[in-house]
Every structure is written in structure tokens, then in C-alpha cells.
Amino acid sequence: GEDALAEARQRYQLPKRYLLNVGTVEVRKNILLGIEALPFLPQDMHLVVVGRKTSYQKKLNSAIQSLGIGDRVHFIQGIPNNLLPAIYRQAEAFIYPSRYDGFGIPIIEAIQSGLPVVAAKGSCLEEAGGPDSLYVDADDAKGLAEAVEKAMQNRTEMVEKSRQYVKRFENQNVAEQIISCYERI
């Protein structure tokens, strides 16, 4: 409840407004795109990335430095499961610009937490996010920023429709759906 929200905000020094990404920080997750999109967004919008770091972190750090947005990007790892929902719930939107991903389980979690989702086109992510999430080219930072702006304007409607859509994963075997998605690729 409210306690978890406050605890998460304090413990992880969460910014007032942030976009969220959850997953291992590795090349194919393409978090670089989220970093490159930040300069196109309002100054008070931050990016919070939750996940285990890999060597890809070096590349991200140099991009953050050259864009001069070090104070706007926050990497957090080792979050206990009981606080993760609080981090989802306080975000403005969920971004998932991954190039090759499985089914995008974090997308479903984000929608269930009441977040609008912006993901990359052309993988199984569209299957997870449904028709009311927004999808952008995996190399288009400005496009990602524009989609985030749009998601925030249409937030209530996007979230309501997407929540309806992801209900199908609650009562069906998600594994079956993932397999059927892969078979089409």
C-alpha cells in the first residue's frame, strides 16, 4: 500500500517523474534508446532502470555523459519483490525498446500496475502489449520521446484498454501464447 510506495521512493531516491524499464541491462534490451530519448523530453522527466548490470553498462554510461543527463538516469538493482510493484506504480510510463525479446512479461506487469507502455516494433512485444500500447522503431530516439508524450496525454484510456487486453494472460496459459508467437516469426 501507501507505505510501500513511500518506502520505495525513499530507499531508492526515486525522482518525482520517471519512465521505467525493468530487465537485465544488456545490449538487446536497447536501453540506450531510452537514454537518447530523454533530451527530447521535459527536463524533469527521469529514467529509472531496474535490473542486473552487464558490460553494456559502460556504453550506457558514456552516452549518459556525452548527453549531459547524468542526474536524470538511475540504475537500481537487487530490489526485493515486495517493493517492485511500488516502483512500477509510481512511474509515468513504461518503456521497453528491446530489439529481440521473448514475450515481454514486464510489459504485462507494467499494464497490470496501471502504466501506459511504449515498446519496440516488430517482435513478440506487440503480442504482450496489445493494440493500445505504442510501438516505435528500435533506433528512433525522438520517436520514442514522442510516443511517451502521447502515452502521457492518453494515459487513462490507454491503461484501461490495455488492462482489458492483458486479462487474457491471467486465465490462459501464457506459455502457449508465447510459443504461438515464436512460431510465426
Segments (PLM) and residue ranges:
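Short alpha-helical donor nucleotide-sugar binding micro-motif in glycosyltransferases
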Residues: 86-91, 96
